[in-house]
Amino acid sequence: MTAAVWTLLLAYLFGSVPAGVLVARTYGVDLRKVGSGNIGATNVLRALGWGPALVVAFFDVFKGGIAVLVARAFGLSDWMLGGVALMAVLGHNYSVFLRFRGGKGVATSFGTLLFLDPVLALWTFPIGLSVILLTRYVSAGSMTGGVAAFVLSLALGRPLWEVATVFLMALLIFWTHRENLKRLREGTERRLGERVEAR
């Protein structure tokens, strides 16, 4: 197989590593059976607190970044870089280690963007964070961040491959948050800081 195919496969496998599940397991907790059942840092925060959540967030961000670094090391084209970024996110969302189930892909999307375009990532981050702090809804901040990244990629005149990559990542974020959107409309969405019983 070519370097491009190998890199796409590696990106998917990097993304598939379920840090949340692995960290929670060290505490004797099955993360898929507590809170929202999601494997990401937000559910780890609800179940186990800030320390484990930050470890998971760090890992989920940088596994996306590592995939991009590997692609650059192989000298792949810009469009392939975008493909590698998306494969890392898809790996997180549909992990081969979890029977093709997974998380929502926000941290991994941010990680890939941070290594693809640090300026765009660092413009996007405070926008999403502000919404989270104002509303205490992580889901709302995540979706706002996805939209902001796409709009900013257009406003800053980024190349087509990058705009397309960011657009697809934003679509994936909305897709994985479809149940959150429903709960937001119904007023039943959990807010940041609400704890759940870890078991």
Swiss-Prot record:
UniProtKB keywords = Cell inner membrane, Cell membrane, Lipid biosynthesis, Lipid metabolism, Membrane, Phospholipid biosynthesis, Phospholipid metabolism, Transferase, Transmembrane, Transmembrane helix
Spell out the NCBIfam families in the cross-references.
glycerol-3-phosphate 1-O-acyltransferase PlsY (TIGR00023)
- The set of disulfide-linked cysteines is none
The UniProt entry's GO biological process terms, in alphabetical order, are:
phospholipid biosynthetic process
Q: Which Pfam families match?
A: G3P_acyltransf (PF02660)
Listed EC numbers: 2.3.1.275
Q: In its keyword annotation, does this UniProt entry include Ligase?
A: no
Specify the pathway: Lipid metabolism; phospholipid metabolism
Q: Which organism is it from?
A: Thermus thermophilus (strain ATCC 27634 / DSM 579 / HB8)
Question: Which terms in the Gene Ontology molecular function aspect does this entry carry?
Answer: acyl-phosphate glycerol-3-phosphate acyltransferase activity
Give me the segments passing through the membrane: 3-23, 50-70, 78-98, 113-133, 154-174
As its record notes, the protein acts as a catalyst of:
an acyl phosphate + sn-glycerol 3-phosphate = a 1-acyl-sn-glycero-3-phosphate + phosphate
Q: Which family does it belong to?
A: Belongs to the PlsY family.
Q: What task does this protein carry out?
A: Catalyzes the transfer of an acyl group from acyl-phosphate (acyl-PO(4)) to glycerol-3-phosphate (G3P) to form lysophosphatidic acid (LPA). This enzyme utilizes acyl-phosphate as fatty acyl donor, but not acyl-CoA or acyl-ACP.
Q: How does it sit in the membrane?
A: Multi-pass membrane protein
Q: How does it assemble?
A: Probably interacts with PlsX.
Query: What's the protein name?
Result: Glycerol-3-phosphate acyltransferase
Keyword check for Transferase, yes or no. yes
Q: Which InterPro entries match?
A: G3P_acylTferase_PlsY
Q: Where is it mainly found? A: membrane
Q: Where does the UniProt annotation locate this protein?
A: Cell inner membrane
